[in-house]
Curated annotation (Swiss-Prot):
EC number of the protein: 3.6.1.31
Gene3D superfamilies registered for this protein in UniProt: MazG-like
Signal sequence coordinates: none
Record pathway: Amino-acid biosynthesis; L-histidine biosynthesis; L-histidine from 5-phospho-alpha-D-ribose 1-diphosphate: step 2/9
GO BP terms: L-histidine biosynthetic process
Gene transcribed to yield this protein: hisE
Gene Ontology CC annotation, any one: cytoplasm
Pfam entry (one): PRA-PH
Localization per Swiss-Prot or TrEMBL: Cytoplasm
Reactions this protein catalyses: 1-(5-phospho-beta-D-ribosyl)-ATP + H2O = 1-(5-phospho-beta-D-ribosyl)-5'-AMP + diphosphate + H(+)
Keyword Zinc belongs to the record: no
Protein name: Phosphoribosyl-ATP pyrophosphatase
SUPFAM superfamilies: all-alpha NTP pyrophosphatases (SSF101386)
Family: Belongs to the PRA-PH family.
Length: 252
């Protein structure tokens, strides 16, 4: 009797990935389909990934036969692995991220993760704060969320909203007041200020503070039981400027 258990999903993905790694460096582009893709370059590979994703979307949207949808999904997974091979990212690394994202913790960071991950490349840019953000959606919905985690890409918010699933893919905006701080020598000020003289004739310093409100557009890209994840779209440079000015440190 054969007591061997069937290969797991991770095992299958890893085996396919190893074959891709072996074939991608073949000197002859006609040696295999993978070799031909890599000889065409990264752009050709990424274009193919996009094409396969579109075909899967169309198959699902058109309610194609189950085997056809499964076939398109397999094509997309295969070409995604080819894309990962460009950067030598194994599927096990992706599965670890998935385990962390959709495990018991979801977006919550104050619990023990289901899988211990290596530090993210953007971990040094992430900041933990607690600030209320007023979200205004294109659909007209308005929701207040409490920040949990913020990075240059976006933020995670705790929200008390019953139908959060419907928010996935929704776009909108929020506004933040960013304070600019500057220090000027009193002898060089171009504005009229009454500054008392000092006995030691030391230069007087005046701190000038101004604030400006900026609008940031977002898209909801993740939803869990009690939180949403949003991605900043549009001008990320201004959001980076807001972070640099500690806009999330003031408040509650």
């Amino acid at each position: 009797m054969n007591n061997l258990s069937p290969p797991s999903t991770v095992d299958i993905l890893e085996q396919v990935y190893q074959v891709i790694q072996q074939r991608k460096s073949a000197p002859d582009p006609e040696a295999s389909y993978v070799a031909k893709l890599f000889h065409k370059g990264d752009d050709a590979i990424l274009k193919k990934v996009g094409e396969e994703a579109t075909e899967l979307v169309l198959a699902i949207k058109g309610r194609a036969a189950r085997n056809e949808v499964a076939h398109e999904a397999a094509d997309l997974i295969f070409h995604t692995l080819v894309g990962l091979a460009i950067m030598n990212i194994p599927p096990t690394e992706v599965m670890n991220v998935l385990s962390s994202r959709f495990g018991k913790t979801g977006l919550t960071r104050n619990q023990t993760p289901s899988v211990e991950l290596e530090p993210s490349r953007r971990q040094f840019e992430r900041r933990l704060h607690s600030k209320t953000i007023h979200l205004i959606f294109s659909s007209g919905i308005t929701i207040d969320g409490l920040t949990r985690d913020i990075s240059l890409d976006g933020m995670q918010l705790h929200v008390d909203y019953a139908d959060k699933v419907r928010l996935l893919g929704e776009k909108g905006y929020f506004e933040l007041s960013v304070q600019n701080k500057a220090t000027f020598n009193a002898n060089n000020l171009l504005v009229g200020l009454e500054i008392p003289t000092t006995m030691d004739n030391n230069p007087l310093m005046a701190a000038v503070h101004s604030a400006r409100t900026y609008r940031f557009e977002f898209e909801i890209v993740r939803v869990t039981e009690d939180a949403i994840g949003l991605r900043i779209i549009g001008d990320k440079g201004m959001f980076s400027f807001a972070l640099a000015n500690e806009v999330f440190n003031d408040l509650m």
